[in-house]
Amino acid sequence: ADAATMEALKKDGRLLAYREAKVDGLAPGSYDTDHTYFGSKLITTGIAVNTAAKSRPASWADLAKPEYKGQIAMPSPLYSGAAAIMLGTMTTRSDLGWKFFEQLKASDAVAVRGNGAVLNAVANGEKSYGVLVDFMAFNAKAKGSPIDFVFPAEGLPAVTEPVAILKTAQNPAAARAFVDFILSDDGQKLASSMGYIPARASAGMPSWYPAGAKIHLMPTNIAQVVQSNAANLKRFAELFGN
């Protein structure tokens, strides 16, 4: 589940708050300030680049330049929760907004069913650039795919795959213990060992993480994303189709 799903469950009054959860050291914005759900990891979205590409973008805005025309694939938010959060995050920014997506459409970018389809398109050279989640790009690169990954200058939207406790939980104490483990250094090191960026930086980065790289996360107002999601998906479908 993603934070948007958790926000909807919270709105419906189905989540049990866990005020004592240890959130010190967690990435800002990775957990609900009312302590009803907590991010287990960070999965960021950036730009995958085929190593044979002639140009290398440094920012999201670069993708709207003429040299990238017809060479971009991205996951459709109609099928990808991470893409829906990306859309809801980017369209609220003054430096990107809907203008960015309109520019992508004018540049003949295509929206495909999900991140897997984006990865395949970039890896096989069908497209030179793809909007893609981090670990998929780096895992493919480690297996020999001709892919690099760019952390765009404006920042990266992220999903957090939160953990939460339902009010109907039959064993709330065990549920709290599970949350404690997920948020602990040991739990976060487990996420890192599985190839994900931990929500707690002290747990250490996954093996694929570039030495010296710094990730700037785009702030996301999840409640606003949920509220605007239906309208956003409708507008996106009008631009890129279903």
Residue ranges, per PLM feature:
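Extracytoplasmic ligand-binding site segments that recognize negatively charged/polar headgroups
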Residues: 1-126
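A ligand-binding cleft/hinge motif common to bilobed small-molecule-binding domains
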Residues: 4-8, 128-146
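Short beta-strand->loop
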Residues: 16-23, 36-39, 61, 129, ...
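Periplasmic-binding protein-like
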Residues: 28-29, 43-44, 70-78, 102-105, 111-112, 181-205, ...
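A bilobed periplasmic-binding-protein/Venus flytrap-type ligand-binding module shared by bacterial periplasmic
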Residues: 46-53, 88, 160-171, 190-191
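Short amphipathic alpha-helical coupling segments at ligand-binding clamshell hinges
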Residues: 59, 100, 161, 170-182, ...
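An extracytoplasmic/periplasmic, membrane-proximal ligand-sensing/linker region
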Residues: 99, 199-242
